[in-house]
């Protein structure tokens, strides 16, 4: 992956919804992580978000945020005023596909947060998940 990541074209990268960098932890960092959500708690939150999506999209041809069409994004990805201002500020850096992917991921983050609208922090988290390394030296495998 390290060798070829820099060769992947932007249109191909645009088809990836989430790209996140992981860093290696040393022993002390791993052992002193504090309280974290258990896998069971995370699973429960994801299942609740899926129920929210299934209910929201009842009667539609799709069930989940990842399946939204461009029209679906317009209808269901309602932004708070500060989220809209933030998105307007970064819009020129996005492709149309990237714009829609960010909104779909932000909608999912808002669902996990039980939020009716997408807020700025949901949107900025989604943007972070679209931050691809600029060269192959930052890619962890």
Where are the regions a protein language model picked out?
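Basic, amphipathic alpha-helical bundle interface domains used for macromolecular binding and assembly
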Residues: 1-140
């Amino acid at each position: 992956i390290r060798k070829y990541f820099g060769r992947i074209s932007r249109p191909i990268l645009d088809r990836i919804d989430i790209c996140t960098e992981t860093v290696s932890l040393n022993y002390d960092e791993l052992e002193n992580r504090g309280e974290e959500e258990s896998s069971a708690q995370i699973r429960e939150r994801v299942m609740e978000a899926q129920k929210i999506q299934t209910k929201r999209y009842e009667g539609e041809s799709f069930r989940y945020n990842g399946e939204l069409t461009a029209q679906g994004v317009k209808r269901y990805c309602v932004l708070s005023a500060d989220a809209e201002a933030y998105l307007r500020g970064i819009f020129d850096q996005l492709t149309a596909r990237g714009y829609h992917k960010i909104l779909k991921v932000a909608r999912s983050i808002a669902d996990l947060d039980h939020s009716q609208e997408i807020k700025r922090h949901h949107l900025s988290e989604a943007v972070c998940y679209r931050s691809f390394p600029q060269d192959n030296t930052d890619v962890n495998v």
